[in-house]
């Protein structure tokens, strides 16, 4: 089970998330409607603060080649995009595609993220998530409405490869609550290990 803490906007939050056991960190870039979107310099600062064993993910809604070049310049391990945006694969950069109910499960990616709300923190469709988890040929990441209180049940019911949280561990958009991060990671690990 892997755990991604997404929508990081502050170095102190990324340092805490890494120490608490997060496997991946997400920063939002070139997404002007998101209150979690950060400029290039801030994304670089956040990623630079991480040790070598945490996966760095850029979440974006851009379709601009120029923006993508700037994103690639900060050297993310993966880029998370909404399906069906056509995205050329770049060597060494994994592609995570976000899908919702009714979307076909894409195969032109390294993993799919089941998120009905496309990052708005609304609960995922459990039946759709179960079908995707059982039929996908790539790893499935569960997102949308997850909190420290419900992540354990979601993991036990759906058995995703990973879980992804943003608003479920925040005090306000982009400001993480360290107590909630620790509780989320603990609950996810306990559910994964059957405790």
Swiss-Prot record:
What is catalysed by this protein? N-(5-phospho-beta-D-ribosyl)anthranilate = 1-(2-carboxyphenylamino)-1-deoxy-D-ribulose 5-phosphate
Q: Which InterPro entries match?
A: Aldolase_TIM (IPR013785), PRAI_dom (IPR001240), RibuloseP-bd_barrel (IPR011060), TrpF_fam (IPR044643)
Q: Which UniProt keywords apply?
A: Amino-acid biosynthesis, Aromatic amino acid biosynthesis, Isomerase, Tryptophan biosynthesis
Task: Give the UniProt record's GO annotations in the biological process aspect.
Answer: L-tryptophan biosynthetic process
A Pfam family name for this chain?
PRAI
Reading the lineage from the top rank, the first entry is: Archaea
Q: Which GO terms describe its molecular function?
A: phosphoribosylanthranilate isomerase activity
Which EC numbers characterise this protein's activity in its record? Answer: 5.3.1.24
Q: Which CDD domains match?
A: PRAI
Which pathway, per its entry? Amino-acid biosynthesis; L-tryptophan biosynthesis; L-tryptophan from chorismate: step 3/5
The UniProt similarity line reads: Belongs to the TrpF family.
Q: What is this protein's record name?
A: N-(5'-phosphoribosyl)anthranilate isomerase
């Amino acid at each position: 089970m892997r755990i991604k803490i997404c929508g990081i906007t502050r170095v102190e939050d990324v340092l805490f998330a890494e120490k608490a056991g997060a496997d991946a960190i997400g920063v939002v870039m070139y997404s002007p409607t998101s209150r979690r979107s950060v400029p290039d310099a801030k994304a670089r600062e956040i990623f630079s603060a991480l040790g070598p064993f945490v996966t760095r993910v850029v979440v974006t809604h851009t379709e601009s080649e120029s923006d993508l070049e700037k994103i690639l310049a900060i050297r993310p391990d993966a880029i998370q995009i909404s399906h069906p945006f056509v995205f050329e694969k770049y060597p060494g950069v994994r592609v995570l595609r976000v899908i919702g109910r009714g979307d076909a499960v894409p195969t032109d990616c390294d993993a799919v993220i089941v998120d009905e709300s496309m990052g708005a923190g609304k609960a995922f469709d459990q039946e759709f998530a179960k079908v995707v988890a059982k039929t996908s040929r790539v790893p499935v990441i569960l997102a949308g409405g997850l909190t420290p209180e419900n992540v354990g049940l979601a993991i036990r019911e759906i058995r995703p490869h990973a879980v992804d949280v943003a608003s479920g561990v925040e005090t306000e958009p982009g400001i993480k609550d360290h107590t909630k991060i620790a509780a989320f990671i603990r609950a996810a690990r306990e559910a994964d290990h059957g405790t």
